[in-house]
Amino acid sequence: MKKETTLSVLIYIFGPVVRFIIVEELVAAAMDFAWNSCLQDMILRSAGSAHSLRIQTMWAFLRLLLSAGAGCLSVRKEALLEKDAFVTAQKQRRLLHKGYAAFGENFKARTMSLLLSAVILLALAINVLFSCIMPDLGSPQSFGNLPGIAGILLQAMLYCFFMPYVEETVFRGILYPRLQRGYGTRTAILGSAAFFGIYHGTLSQGIYALIMGLVFAAAYEAAGSFKVPFALHGACNLAVLLLQWTDTYKTFCKPLWAAVFTGTAVCGFFMINLIIKKTAE
């Protein structure tokens, strides 16, 4: 009986995440089959070899958009319920803990600015460290590239808005509060970050996602608002995209810059901690 109860709890916690991944993979597989079986030859033949790279990149973007979107829609009901329940619970907790006010109703612009800056610098530091120490693994974040203003806008919408929303909905919006209710806040932060890392697949992306997942989950816990991890996630992707667009990524791929980014990020997190403690007094 105990095993059945444990199994039902695990299904309740991880069921939506598994469903999201299954739907996402099925849609992606269907699009791959359609592309490889008939669409690739037909489209590339009519467009010409000069546009083949752009068309293949566009198809990759469309594949990501449709597969992730379908996966997100499959867990939409759970996401809405969990977000509302989590926000309500956090508001009740703030009545008992003044420290949460710094990230709640009395959230200051300077606190958000510090948090945003610190998280972006941490994201850049991890990317730079991987590029310096383990170049064979590649950058933790690597985005497809489309030329022109239209390509830039498409990338910005996909990687700075759409994908952060989808991933935060699944891993912070659903998985985190369910883990928290079952196993506590620390386990929820670690568990949601771990599954976020596993979801990203490769070693470099997995480690990067694990570290950033810890930050996003902690920010969600402290702020009690889905907007905060969503904004942080989008801002981190935008920072890496800006380096890619301006072709300055290689300039910063040096240990010195990694140390500068990391040190500044740590200072930012330290100042945020001081703000919370001061508010709690």
Feature roles, as predicted:
Residues 7-24, 67, 113-123, 191:
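Alpha-helical transmembrane segments
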Residues 10, 14, 110-117, 153, ...:
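Hydrophobic alpha-helical transmembrane segments
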Residues 21-33, 193, 205-261:
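Functionally important transmembrane alpha-helices
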Residues 31, 35-54, 83-163, 176-177, ...:
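Juxtamembrane helix-loop-helix connectors linking adjacent transmembrane helices
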Residues 76-84, 270-281:
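Membrane-interface capping segments at transmembrane-helix boundaries
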Residues 185-200, 234:
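Small-polar-interrupted transmembrane alpha-helices in polytopic inner-membrane proteins
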